[in-house]
From Swiss-Prot:
InterPro entries xref list: FUZ/MON1/HPS1_longin_1, FUZ/MON1/HPS1_longin_2, FUZ/MON1/HPS1_longin_3, Mon1
Protein name: Protein SAND
CC per GO annotation: Mon1-Ccz1 complex
Gene name of the encoded protein: sand
Regions crossing the membrane: none
Length: 520
């Protein structure tokens, strides 16, 4: 029942984080200032590296913001044939052939089958002419008539100078997102709000734009309204499939944030300064990942990366194993930075058997060898220092257990610092080891998130009881916090646990967050 609402391994489980080498002298011991943005645990001490760090609303805005950095990235100027070569090169087509598992796409499902109907969430993408572009389950050809009906609904409402946003019927939501020249439709039987589902459709839209650029997309449909966009996107469906999977499982996409590899502050500083020293004229962003966790990010001064763009980059890297085979070079549009042109990303792993992946983002399509040289200079500098071995040791235990917090009733939590756009959470405990249980817990977090960000009646605090767990959500100007407790706990105990948790995060913030990001 609902309560009150107000306006890697076993070895890791008992491990502790590395001893504090040095805490920031100007950081308050008490987490109380976290009620104000910029003073919360995990707040950056210098300018943040994410633009719009709090922008959940940014995902559901009516119109796109005009990029302040417009002109930094050149318009690619590719013809349609050239673009097809870009989208179809090795980083897309061959990766698709070797990386997509039978479980990742259910293209053989018939829409009249029970299996197809049993999916709790469907996503469809079509053109304004009603041409099918993508479906999560089943084949686009078999669903072409269904998508035609969807487009007819959109057109009928628009003919009356109105916009269809959603349809609610019999426990099912149908959400529409019109982003000319595309229309995206989500059909859901989950407890997610319209706004949550709209956020997911926005991510899918940005994923498509990242492959083509909005300029090219508009150009194609201006010349031929009934163009079949699947010709250009062939082989890239696995990226959208994987992104949808991440939307169901990754708290970062829910929180509009990124999580960091827990790492001693002194080690992270050495890694960051080594990356900063390996700069080049056209280099805009240097990103070092450890799986789905951020080790460090160095950016060009006055150029900011949006967390959505970083999520798209992480999705590209995480969707393919072929980047481990050598140095990759791929065009990618970062739609929250500039929808008009491509960046070019040098993607490689520091070691073939390591999870450390380096992404160097350049504005020059001919910059492969310069970026390769940057990587070598970074490696040469880093391998001369003991920090590299410490970094590799940290990979053996890339998370931490909730037991380290010292709150017996606490099972799991999500904490986001609003000013930094970073979040932290422990590994899932034994009770939530199965995929089904993790998705169920994420569904509960999504429900809490929906209440806190309700478009009409947003809440600051929400406490919910279920048969399996009790949950608490709290949002302030400085942070968002979601906690999962044993069902035997009480609301008073949960509120008391918040202060203990914030103190623990404050004590460990040097290794859980990047407090002082560097620039070139």
């Amino acid at each position: 029942m609902d309560g009150e609402a107000q306006n890697e391994s076993v070895a890791c489980e008992k491990a502790t984080l590395a001893p504090v080498d040095r805490l920031r002298s100007n950081r308050a011991e008490s987490p109380t200032p976290g009620l104000v943005e910029g003073t919360e645990p995990g707040a950056v001490q210098k300018s943040a590296f994410f633009a719009h760090a709090q922008s959940f609303e940014d995902l559901t805005a009516e119109a796109e913001e005009k990029a302040e950095q417009e002109g930094v990235v050149e318009d690619s100027g590719q013809t349609e044939d050239e673009l097809q070569v870009l989208v179809g090169e090795r980083t897309i087509t061959e990766q698709h052939a070797q990386d997509v598992s039978p479980q990742s796409r259910s293209k053989e499902e018939d829409m009249s089958s029970e299996a197809w109907r049993s999916h709790r969430k469907h996503v469809f993408v079509l053109s304004e002419a009603g041409k099918p572009i993508y479906t999560r389950y089943g084949s686009e050809e078999a669903l072409s008539s269904t998508m035609g009906v969807m487009m007819a609904l959109v057109s009928f409402v628009e003919s009356d100078k109105n916009t269809i946003r959603s349809i609610h019927a019999d426990g099912c939501k149908v959400i529409f997102l019109a982003k000319s020249p595309l229309v995206l439709v989500g059909v859901s039987q989950t407890y997610q709000s319209d706004k949550e589902l709209l956020r997911e459709l926005q991510y899918i839209y940005y994923q498509i734009v990242s492959l083509l650029t909005l300029t090219q997309l508009n150009h194609i449909f201006q010349n031929k309204q009934n163009y079949d966009l699947r010709r250009l996107l062939a082989g890239s469906e696995y990226l959208t499939d994987n992104l949808l999977h991440r939307l169901d499982r990754d708290p970062g996409l829910l929180l509009s944030a990124v999580t960091c590899l827990p790492l001693s502050n002194s080690v992270r500083d050495v890694v960051s300064s080594s990356l900063q020293a390996a700069k080049a004229k056209n280099l805009v962003f240097s990103i070092l990942l450890a799986g789905d966790r951020l080790v460090t990010l160095v950016r060009k001064k006055d150029q900011f990366l949006h967390h959505i763009d970083l999520h798209l980059v992480m999705n590209l890297v995480g969707s393919s194993s072929s980047f481990r085979e050598g140095e990759g070079w791929t065009p990618i549009c970062l739609p929250k930075f500039n929808t008009a042109g491509f960046f070019h990303a040098h993607i490689s792993y520091l070691e073939s058997a390591s999870d450390l992946c380096l992404i160097l983002v350049s504005t020059d399509r001919e910059d492969f060898f310069n970026m390769s040289d940057c990587k070598q200079r970074f490696l040469e500098r880093l391998t001369k220092r003991t920090a590299y071995q410490a970094l590799k040791e940290a990979l053996k235990c890339p998370s931490y257990s909730v037991e380290q917090v010292g709150i017996p009733e606490l099972r799991h939590f999500l904490y986001k610092s609003k000013s930094s756009g970073l979040y932290t959470s422990p590994e899932f405990p034994e009770l939530y080891q199965s995929d089904e249980e993790q998705e169920r817990l994420m569904g509960l977090y999504q429900d809490l998130h929906s209440h806190l960000h309700h478009p009409v009646r947003p809440l600051r605090f929400f406490y919910r009881c279920t048969n399996k767990e009790n949950l608490l959500a709290w949002v302030t100007n400085g942070f968002q916090l979601y906690l999962c407790f044993s069902p035997l706990g009480t609301k008073a105990m949960a509120v008391s646990a918040v202060n203990k948790l914030l103190k623990w995060i404050r004590k460990e913030e040097d290794r859980l967050f990047i407090l002082s990001p560097l620039t070139y």
